[in-house]
């Protein structure tokens, strides 16, 4: 068996072992969030609104905390949109 075949065999073995361990872990997590009810459970899984702070690049105006985005020169001399 050459080196390449040995490496492939080890990768396959590691993948199989990882899948077995992941299956066992998933069973342990099945009831992890059952103690939370109603609004408390919604807060855990609700995505909090995030905004881009001023001075950071902004792809869309609605993602800026200030709700405004203008073209400004960056450190490389290129013009990019940044949150105000």
UniProtKB/Swiss-Prot annotation:
A biological-process GO annotation: defense response
Pfam families: Omega-toxin
Tissue-specificity statement: Expressed by the venom gland.
Signal sequence annotation: 1-22
Propeptide: 23-45
GO cellular component, one term: extracellular region
Molecular function GO terms recorded: calcium channel inhibitor activity; toxin activity
Site feature location: Critical for insecticidal activity: 57, 74, 82
Keywords annotated in UniProt: Calcium channel impairing toxin, Cleavage on pair of basic residues, Disulfide bond, Ion channel impairing toxin, Knottin, Secreted, Signal, Toxin, Voltage-gated calcium channel impairing toxin
Disulfide bridges in this chain: 51-65, 58-69, 64-83
Compartments in which it is found: Secreted
Primary location class: secreted
Function: Inhibits insect, but not mammalian, voltage-gated calcium channels (Cav).
Note: Several paralogs that code for the same precursor are shown in this entry, whereas other paralogs are shown in AC S0F211, AC S0F205, AC S0F1N1, AC S0F212.
Domains: entry comment: The presence of a 'disulfide through disulfide knot' structurally defines this protein as a knottin.
Family under the similarity heading: Belongs to the neurotoxin 08 (Shiva) family. 01 (omega toxin) subfamily.
UniProt-recorded name of the protein: Omega-hexatoxin-Hvn1b
Upper classification of the organism: Eukaryota, Metazoa, Ecdysozoa, Arthropoda, Chelicerata
């Amino acid at each position: 068996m050459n080196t390449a075949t040995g490496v492939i065999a080890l990768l396959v073995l590691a993948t199989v072992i990882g899948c077995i361990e992941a299956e066992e872990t998933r069973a342990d997590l099945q009831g992890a969030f059952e103690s939370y009810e109603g609004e408390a459970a919604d807060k855990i899984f609700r995505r909090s609104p995030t905004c881009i702070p001023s001075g950071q690049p902004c792809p869309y105006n609605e993602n800026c905390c200030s709700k405004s985005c203008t073209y400004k020169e960056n450190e490389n001399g290129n013009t990019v949109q940044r949150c105000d």
